């Protein structure tokens, strides 16, 4: 039905007859001539109908927005005065010779031109219309090109695309599972995979030493702008490769992807340990475009007569950190109060500050509610250590180290945005040497997952002192977003059992949940390592979208619902009876 896409017609086609199909983006009658903007996935082209062909002209005069039509005509160059440089096809137009209305359209329930006026609910309910917008179409086509480039790279490097099961067994991976009841085994359930983690490890044990899969994963968790109940991973696993080799290979892939898709050279990715990232930036995924850093000053404040500072400064688990904001002395008291409320969201009890109005006047040129507790030597050392100058403000976080990192790390990002301090467009890095475990409510939890290998210890040494052990794990970070994370995996049954015990998983529970893995580890398991990238997040960053919902064809809402299909829905009684399931209505509790 077509000879060309609308957006592909150009000056090289002048004089040629073309057949186009698409949707009427806009139609207007100007002085007896009908101008039609025809749209398809590749873009827009202007079609002109004049009265010389009255039958065709009369049909063209009836067109309305979003009619689906076929156009036949001859390509001609526009006069120089009419060239539209903002339009891909702006140098030409098509003189219409024939026109077929394939299907008419009722007035749309949402606007495609002023889409900002559409609610998120409307956009998702009528997603098939929202996707007609050029911006949305371009993002999905960009996504298709990215997945194609990823496949080409991995295929050319000896990786095999192998599918793993979607119906599998529930395993503790951090989030709630989506459960699928079994009709055959009543009362038992499959789980939709949160990742193909265990199956890809089993593939390594099977001898497929380079695996990849672009795969759907499912997590029943609270949603945010960068979370969806179903999402797509670029999943990679290798045998006989070190963490360094895995990082080098996947970095090569990501650098090639940005060069091919955006003509951006990311350069070599710097490496930073987890401890350094938390100390300097208060985050394990630091945005290096932001030049602000947290500076430790606890050693200067241990003896001051101000418990807010001296308390955390003398606490092994406490921290006092300073954050210098260039030009921040211009902040009003209300703005400082707003910052104080902001850090309170992250558990901080307050925010001390010091305005450096004029350093040539010594302490007289400094304004601060805590200045009376500090002598001149301490103030000067804080100024020197932070690199502060006249016109700056220094903000202080003092609390448990975790609270300081989270609150001041978030404030660092906010201040960087507020003061337009971000430098450069793309700043990647690797964060390495993560802790093996973290303690939550007195119990150990895996920082990555229970199958991550520790670095350089025996099972006995790990169990003797789990709190201070480092994992052989690595995260790729770009502009403050984690693109992907991975690790060397445990390939020794004794080590895997030790990790389970540290996590409070008894031998009986481990056998019930992971017996297949523990047995597989007995049969010559090779060393293996891997990584998984969040494809949706990569596309979001590369296209400048504000949410991963804008780079997915049919996403869910922030409450994990689909307004388009009204999913989830109720199952009919017969289906429930076949599954042996009864729905129990819980009474709402009153306050």
From Swiss-Prot:
Signal peptide per UniProt: none
EC number: 6.1.1.12
GO molecular function, one term: nucleic acid binding
InterPro entries for this protein: Aa-tRNA-synt_II, aa-tRNA-synth_II, aa-tRNA-synth_II/BPL/LPL, Asp-tRNA-ligase_1, Asp-tRNA-ligase_1_N, Asp/Asn-tRNA-synth_IIb, AspRS_core, GAD-like_sf
Cell compartment(s), UniProt: Cytoplasm
The keyword Ribonucleoprotein is annotated on this UniProt entry: no
Region span, Aspartate: 197-200
UniProt-listed Pfam families: GAD (PF02938), tRNA-synt_2 (PF00152), tRNA_anti-codon (PF01336)
Binding-site positions, L-aspartate: 173, 219, 448, 489
Record family assignment: Belongs to the class-II aminoacyl-tRNA synthetase family. Type 1 subfamily.
Entry-linked HAMAP family: Asp_tRNA_synth_type1
Protein name, entry field: Aspartate--tRNA ligase
Upper classification of the organism: Bacteria, Pseudomonadati, Pseudomonadota, Gammaproteobacteria, Alteromonadales
Gene: aspS
């Amino acid at each position: 039905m077509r000879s060309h896409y609308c957006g592909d017609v150009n000056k090289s086609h002048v004089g040629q007859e073309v057949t186009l199909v698409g949707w009427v983006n806009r139609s207007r009658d100007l002085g007896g001539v009908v101008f039609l903007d025809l749209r398809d996935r590749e873009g827009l082209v202007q079609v002109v109908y004049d009265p010389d062909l009255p039958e065709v002209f009369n049909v063209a005069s009836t067109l309305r927005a979003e009619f689906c039509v076929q156009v036949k005509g001859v390509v001609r160059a526009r006069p120089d005065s009419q060239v539209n440089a903002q339009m891909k096809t702006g140098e030409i137009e098509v003189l219409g010779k024939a026109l077929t209305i394939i299907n008419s359209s009722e007035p749309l329930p949402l606007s495609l031109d002023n889409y900002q006026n559409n609610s998120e609910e409307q956009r998702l309910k009528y997603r098939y219309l929202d996707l007609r917008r050029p911006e949305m179409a371009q993002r999905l086509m960009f996504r298709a090109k990215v997945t194609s480039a990823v496949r080409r790279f991995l295929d050319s490097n000896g990786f095999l695309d192998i599918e793993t099961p979607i119906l599998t067994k529930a395993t503790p991976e951090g989030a709630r599972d989506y459960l699928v009841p079994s009709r055959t085994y009543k009362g038992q359930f499959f789980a939709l995979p949160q990742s193909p983690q265990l199956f890809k490890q089993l593939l390594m044990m099977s001898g497929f030493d380079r695996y990849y899969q672009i795969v759907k994963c499912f997590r029943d968790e609270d949603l945010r702008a960068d979370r969806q109940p179903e999402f797509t991973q670029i999943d990679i696993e290798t045998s006989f490769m070190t963490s360094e080799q895995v990082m080098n290979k996947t970095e090569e892939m990501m650098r090639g992807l940005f060069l091919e898709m955006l003509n951006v050279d990311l350069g070599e990715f710097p490496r930073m340990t987890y401890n350094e990232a938390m100390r300097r930036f208060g985050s394990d995924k630091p945005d290096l475009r932001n030049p602000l850093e947290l500076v430790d000053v606890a050693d200067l404040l241990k003896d001051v007569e101000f418990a807010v500072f001296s308390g955390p400064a003398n606490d092994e688990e406490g921290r006092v950190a300073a954050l210098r904001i260039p030009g921040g002395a211009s902040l009003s008291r209300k703005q400082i109060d707003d910052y104080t409320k902001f850090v309170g969201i992250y558990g901080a009890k307050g925010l001390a500050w010091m305005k450096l109005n004029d350093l040539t006047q010594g302490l007289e040129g400094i304004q601060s509610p805590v200045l009376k507790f500090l002598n001149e030597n301490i103030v000067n050392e804080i100024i020197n250590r932070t690199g502060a100058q006249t016109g700056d403000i220094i903000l202080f976080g003092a609390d448990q180290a975790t609270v300081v990192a989270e609150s001041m790390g978030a404030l660092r990002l906010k201040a960087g945005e507020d003061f337009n301090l971000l430098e450069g467009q793309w700043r990647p890095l690797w964060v390495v040497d993560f802790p093996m475990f973290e303690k939550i409510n007195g119990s150990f939890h895996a920082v990555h997952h229970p199958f991550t290998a520790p670095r350089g210890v025996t099972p006995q040494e790990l169990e003797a002192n789990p709190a201070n052990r480092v994992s052989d794990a690595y995260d790729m970070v770009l502009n403050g977003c984690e693109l992907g994370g991975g690790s060397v995996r445990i390939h020794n049954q004794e080590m895997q059992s030790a990790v389970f015990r540290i996590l409070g998983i008894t031998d009986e529970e481990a056998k019930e949940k992971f017996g297949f893995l523990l047995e597989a580890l007995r049969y010559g398991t090779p060393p293996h390592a891997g990584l998984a990238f969040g494809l949706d997040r990569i596309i979001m960053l590369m296209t400048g979208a504000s949410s991963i919902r804008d780079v997915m064809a049919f996403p869910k809402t922030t409450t994990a619902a689909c307004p388009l299909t009204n999913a989830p829905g109720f199952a009919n009684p017969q289906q429930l009876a076949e599954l042996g399931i009864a729905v129990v209505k819980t009474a709402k509790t009153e306050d």
